[in-house]
Amino acid sequence: MPELLALPIASEYTIIPKNSISSAGIGLGEWMGAHPEVETCIVVGDCTDLCTYQLAMHLRLYANEHQLQRRVVLPENCVQTFDIPVDVAAQIGAFAHPGDLYHYVFLYHMAHNGVEVVKELC
């Protein structure tokens, strides 16, 4: 994203490309293992129930598996998902995707699994 790359801290980013909604098998686990000093991961994204969920859960489960006291924080105002009403889905041959419902269900599920879902970052 050009907006993120324009921030003054952009030189500190580590960009790990991926080819699907999954965060597994892309080198993220190896990077996390090589950087035990990272205590907090902040997750943002454009599909709460897809990529964002996969990333947050991958980070949380990795920390659990390796007994790390690493925080995974997801600001609610930095995620959202899309909506496809039933009638539109029927017309285009897709599954309905109730955006508001999925957004809140997946936020709840992440919180239930140890991701710190917060309203916003201060």
Predicted features by range, described:
Residues 1-122:
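Active-site-adjacent betaalpha module
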